[in-house]
Amino acid sequence: MKIIKHSFDGVIVGAGGAGLRAAIEAAPHMKLAVITKLYPTRSHTGAAQGGMSAALANVEEDNWNWHAFDTVKGSDYLADQPAVDILCKEAIDAVIELEHWGLPFSRLDNGKIAQRRFGGHTVHEGTSPAFRACYAADRTGHMILQTLYQKCVSMGVTFFDEFQVLDIKIEDGVCQGVIAYELATGDIHIFETRAVTFATGGFGKIFKVSSNAHSLTGDGPGILYQKGIPLEAVSYTHLTLPTNREV
């Protein structure tokens, strides 16, 4: 076993949809590494089939305010409402951005991105169902991963695939790096950095019943919790898809 040191301006832990998108945003501004215990296109984002919701209004009248209303209502009014507003406003540009990067969305006869109804989405604040979910056949999440990963590769992002993060290094209250285990060799890698982003996904597989991938074991939140870093809303986790009333 060897101990290998690396130096990067920033490190992202996790290479699902969130981690890859964060890498695209950060890569032009810093020397960046993405550490992932899976090959990026195997991440659980690929399990999402139904679509990505955005008020494009390609099929019928729609706007982001109605999307925000549905999102807050769907959270039993517990969601951070300013964050919901940002999500629903920026979802429109995010879908168009993915289209420009090459995501093969399904299309309407007029060539626009196809949209379909999906649970809980309405127009006029609950009056009738909305055509809001933008989709790529039945493999939307898979195509999102492929598109984001291709974009990262084209930008020269450095990936460390099949590396299990073990710990973070904190000195004087400041994160100084990440310690990871290379699965193929058993070598320990120390990543010295001044910025770390955790995008390790959910933790449904700590429960007996879950449709989450077997890789979703809560490694990231567990590491942070052990270091005394506060976690937010850990009681809200997605156990199954489709969503069920009883498990």
Residue ranges and their predicted role:
Residues 99-187, 192, 199:
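Conserved redox-cofactor binding core of oxidoreductases
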Residues 12, 16-17, 39, 139, ...:
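Residue-level detector of alpha-helix initiation sites
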Residues 28-47:
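Glycine-rich FAD pyrophosphate-binding loop
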Residues 1-10:
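Extreme N-terminal leader/targeting segments of oxidoreductases
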Residues 10-33:
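N-terminal Rossmann-like FAD-binding beta1-loop-alpha1 element of flavoenzymes
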Residues 54-86:
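Glycine-rich active-site loop/strand segments that organize a redox cofactor
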Residues 83-89, 133-147, 211-215:
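Short beta-strand to alpha-helix junction loop
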Residues 237-243:
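Conserved small/polar residues in nucleotide/adenosyl-binding loops
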